[in-house]
Amino acid sequence: MAGKRELLMLENFIGGKFLPCNSYIDSYDPSTGEVYCKVPNSGKEEIEAAVEAAREAFPAWSSRSPQERSLVLNRLADVLEQSLEELAQAESKDQGKTLTLARTMDIPRSVLNFRFFASSNLHHVSECTQMSHLGCMHYTVRTPVGIAGLISPWNLPLYLLTWKIAPAIAAGNTVIAKPSEMTSVTAWMFCKLLDKAGVPPGVINIVFGTGPRVGEALVSHPEVPLISFTGSQPTAERITQLSAPHCKKLSLELGGKNPAIIFEDANLEECIPATVRSSFANQGEICLCTSRIFVQRSIYSEFLKRFVEATRKWKVGVPSDPSANMGALISKAHLEKVRSYVLKAQTEGARILCGEGVDQLSLPLRNQAGYFMLPTVITDIKDESRCMTEEIFGPVTCVVPFDSEEEVITRANSVRYGLAATVWSKDVGRIHRVAKKLQSGLVWTNCWLIRELNLPFGGMKSSGIGREGAKDSYDFFTEIKTITIKY
């Protein structure tokens, strides 16, 4: 009889040391449905220890020059890059995404986050003005806020954790980070690299556990004046409630119900593969994924036929399979939630053209209990349907026709979210008109997911509060002060 497999045991990282926890929670391999890891079930006690460590580290770290801090960030990028393959393997196993995606996007982008903020941190300028008639000069300075509370999601675990840590410590803050309890492994591995990169103890503290226990303890702590959160709207509402008594600075990057608008002059050779990717990349578990596709009626039938054909070629497979385009969803509960949207659409009279309930999914025996789902295309669905108004966060997209430019803008803007949109057309004038009228924080035209990290990232309406990016992140992680000199 084969021996029982040993589970990976994670520990909190506080004050430069790994510390065990009194209790642990199970973490699952999404591709098999098996428990493979134990994550600390931290709470108030661990947050108190992390706050003490971050408080002690803050004076020395914040006193370092931007140049000195940037050297540390670049060393962090170096050690991450040296561990790229190991981190990619772990990210794929922990999250369910394909190993190819982890290798080519998640870990390289984590490296870039530190390199980018190491550079941008050196190029901020202050404002200065004179009032000669009063003999006064005014100028501004920015100072770090203090201890930054960072809460990152499960869909892009290390990618979004480092997107928060890098600008926070570059600006001179110390941090307490809480990754998702479902995808904590690469954050734990990251902690092992900090000493090698020369990060002083207490500058980066990572505490693992659930939102209701450790997340609430972090958000409500009076010595944590700033919270950066990426995740769901209900959790953001709770964070806002807990933060209000302390008047904390908040950055909330939430969900989306992102439209793609495809006009009759679109280049379908480019549009269709790009829209398949924007709909189903990372199992549709990216806040920027397309979940509503509006196609001008004159090309609707052709687009739909070709889009479904291309979707059926989008291979679902074991994450380690180099030919797989899609891996497993994050959890059994999430898989059931995504499937429930498809069932609801069917009861409303919508047609499922491919995917869930239509096509057969073939997997190796070991992976048949994993959380896999075929990419699913829905049509003949009303704009008021839950599938057209609520964030599904899975491999499900709806395709509907439209007639006029004005009509499609109104329909695209009809949901409570406003994170991202894509527009496909050869008419430059139309692109500018439509992009300006869309209620989205990001609009891609004739492309998707091309990011310039110097520019703002974030959404409108219920998609969040604030922006992230070079200057926006620097402004968020610092306090501005106006100084007046009488001469």
From Swiss-Prot:
GO molecular function: aminomuconate-semialdehyde dehydrogenase activity; retinal dehydrogenase activity
Keyword entries, A-Z: Cytoplasm, NAD, Oxidoreductase, Phosphoprotein
Function: Catalyzes the NAD-dependent oxidation of 2-aminomuconic semialdehyde of the kynurenine metabolic pathway in L-tryptophan degradation.
Presence of the UniProt keyword Protein biosynthesis in the record: no
Site (Transition state stabilizer): 155
Active site, renumbered: 253, 287
Signal peptide annotation: none
Name the UniProt record assigns to this protein: 2-aminomuconic semialdehyde dehydrogenase
Locations listed in the record: Cytoplasm
Phosphoserine PTM positions: 362
